[in-house]
């Protein structure tokens, strides 16, 4: 439900208070989650942690930095990212949420593509939002705008 309220409440507030500050992509408004960095401002993993350090480092729970990844990474890459975050920063929680791509005929596709490299069919893409996997095609207008605004990181973005 949280992903739908980010759009619905922002839309209602924008109608009642036209000057209110929301995130937006053209006419599609949305709110970001709590004290998260606005998705348009994300540059990379390290810079996200540096930005959030002062505030989120004060918490012992109830907050998380989501690393929304363009695609899958290896277990060793994930360990390296988590180790760097835990060694260099004080934020209490981090999640790594890659986009997973699936062809209806050929299964999981590792490449960062929209069509199956074997048959050319459009891929179904899934990413974790609000704690569970959702098909990106099923996002509401606000969540789609947020997704389109967000930088999807790669392993190479770890030092940015």
Over which residues does each language-model region extend?
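Long, C-terminal-biased catalytic regions of enzyme "large/alpha" subunits
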Residues: 1-160
């Amino acid at each position: 439900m949280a992903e739908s309220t980010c759009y619905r409440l922002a839309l209602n507030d924008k109608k009642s208070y036209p000057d209110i500050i929301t995130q937006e992509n053209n006419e599609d408004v949305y709110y970001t989650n709590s004290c998260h960095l606005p998705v348009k401002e994300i540059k990379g993993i390290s810079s996200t942690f540096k930005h959030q350090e002062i505030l989120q480092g004060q918490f012992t729970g109830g907050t998380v930095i989501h690393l929304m990844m363009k695609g899958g990474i290896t277990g060793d890459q994930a360990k390296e990212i988590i180790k760097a975050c835990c060694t260099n920063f004080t934020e209490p929680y981090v999640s790594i949420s890659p986009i997973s791509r699936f062809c209806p005929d050929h299964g999981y596709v590792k490449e960062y593509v929209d069509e199956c490299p074997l048959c050319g069919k459009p891929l179904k893409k899934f990413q974790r939002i609000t704690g569970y996997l959702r098909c990106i095609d099923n996002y509401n207008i606000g969540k789609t705008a947020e997704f389109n605004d967000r930088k999807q990181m790669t392993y190479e973005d770890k030092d940015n």
